[in-house]
């Protein structure tokens, strides 16, 4: 028997306590990650095929440690959120007008 197995066998209460605390530690780590924000790009796929009249709001997420490129997320009238292509001429024009106002 290995020393770790022998230790666990001789301390079942400690093993039980460790198993009880494990979900708490995982939950705490997950909550901390959510607090810091997701460290990944939200927009994996973008589109330039959305008409402006279908958009109710726009959200721009700047490039940073979470993602190397800026992201433009549109909320549509049906509630769906999609990522728009920042390089599309139409969206560049919209962003320019938003920044000017």
Swiss-Prot record:
InterPro entries: Chemokine_b/g/d, Chemokine_CXC, Chemokine_CXC_CS, Chemokine_IL8-like_dom, CXC_Chemokine_domain, Interleukin_8-like_sf. Gene3D superfamilies: 2.40.50.40. Coiled coil: none annotated. Disulfide bonds join 41-67, 43-83. Keywords: Chemotaxis, Cytokine, Disulfide bond, Heparin-binding, Phosphoprotein, Secreted, Signal. GO terms for cellular component: collagen-containing extracellular matrix; cytoplasm; extracellular region; extracellular space; platelet alpha granule lumen. Residues 1-31 form the signal peptide. Induction: By inflammatory conditions. Its main location: secreted. The keyword Signal applies. It is found in: Secreted. The modification Phosphoserine is found at residue 57. One of its GO terms (biological process) is killing by host of symbiont cells. GO terms for molecular function: chemokine activity; CXCR chemokine receptor binding; CXCR3 chemokine receptor binding; heparin binding; receptor ligand activity. SMART domains: SCY. PROSITE patterns: SMALL_CYTOKINES_CXC (PS00471). Heparin binds at residues 92-98. The keyword RNA-binding does not apply. PANTHER family: PLATELET FACTOR 4, SMALL INDUCIBLE CYTOKINE A. Chemokine released during platelet aggregation that plays a role in different biological processes including hematopoiesis, cell proliferation, differentiation, and activation. Acts via different functional receptors including CCR1, CXCR3A or CXCR3B. Upon interaction with CXCR3A receptor, induces activated T-lymphocytes migration mediated via downstream Ras/extracellular signal-regulated kinase (ERK) signaling. Neutralizes the anticoagulant effect of heparin by binding more strongly to heparin than to the chondroitin-4-sulfate chains of the carrier molecule. Belongs to the intercrine alpha (chemokine CxC) family. Homotetramer. Interacts with TNFAIP6 (via Link domain). Interacts with CCR1. Interacts with CXCR3. Interacts with THBD; this interaction enhances generation of activated protein C. This is Platelet factor 4. It comes from Homo sapiens. The gene is PF4.
């Amino acid at each position: 028997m290995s020393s770790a197995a022998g230790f666990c066998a001789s301390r079942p209460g400690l093993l039980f306590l460790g198993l009880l605390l494990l979900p708490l530690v995982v939950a705490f780590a997950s909550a901390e990650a959510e607090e810091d924000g997701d460290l990944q790009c939200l927009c994996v796929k973008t589109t330039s095929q959305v008409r402006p009249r279908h958009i109710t709001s726009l959200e721009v997420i700047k490039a940073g440690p979470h993602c190397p490129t800026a992201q433009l997320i549109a909320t549509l009238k049906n509630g769906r959120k999609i990522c728009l292509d920042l390089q599309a001429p139409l969206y560049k024009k919209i962003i320019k007008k938003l920044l000017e106002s």
